[in-house]
């Protein structure tokens, strides 16, 4: 301990999460957190005029379902939805705006050993950080965590002479509702292309994945900035390729071709339901996710008046909020503070063993 004269102390305080302190010894100056960040940010002042907040253009309102009745039930069966999933996972997320809680432990069989159908994301288990990269408290340190999702190429942010002059589009969350997704596609009308992620009996998954990769590469080289991977075309003749494989294949292929930074990979899938499924999709490279089947299943329960006084838009908002909170929790376990650092990082590991290796 060093004794100091209290009269010589100009200010007292402590560093909070994400804050820094600078000292310039030769000039005898101390710079607080705000001074340092203002100094660094002034180099990018012109970015303010280029940043466009998409949340203002894509509000959650006028939500509507896509499928209903027999079509919806067939899709739920196709993607492995059970009554337990709808009642114990989906319903609490919309009702309480947070993940459902249950007893400690998971005594279900590993997906690879199960004799029942299990979605591919069940084969993935979440990792957690070790001492070298401590976890973050997503509740108390939420100021340093963000789900902001950016569209557009920033170029090399370390090269002040070669910064992009294009607009930068930002969303506060990577989760898009059905109405938001429809407006999103319309907004990027000339710069988006949809790739069908279903295959028929004349194809196999490996050949379809190769086709999807090549199609994505061609679109990017043509100047497309928004690729949409969709399994909505599923039918009696068309079977969905697991979206995890599609995203992983496209993300890895474009990265190898040094094209990934020029495009966003947007996903429209019936697979996404709980926070783990969203986390795995983003973890293998998805930029945004539209869980159309989960939202339609939500509407099905809303029509049965199972949410009491809540309007459908409120149910959707609460569901999206619960997914966002779940993503922050999963990221915090790995000590990751922003979604862009989690995206494509593959911080989960898998128990899956395939007889034929498919490069994703």
Label the model's feature ranges.
Residues 31-36, 40-198, 204-212, 217, ...:
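Extended, highly charged accessory segments
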Residues 229-244:
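Glycine-rich, proline-tolerant flexible connector loops at the mouths of alpha/beta enzymes
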Residues 349-356:
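Conserved small/polar residues in nucleotide/adenosyl-binding loops
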Residues 140-146, 230-233, 268-275, 336-349:
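A glycine-rich phosphate-binding loop feature that marks nucleotide/adenosyl-phosphate handling sites
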Residues 242-261:
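Alpha-helix-loop-beta-strand connector modules within alpha/beta enzyme cores
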Residues 213-227, 279-280, 284-287:
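Alpha/beta enzyme core
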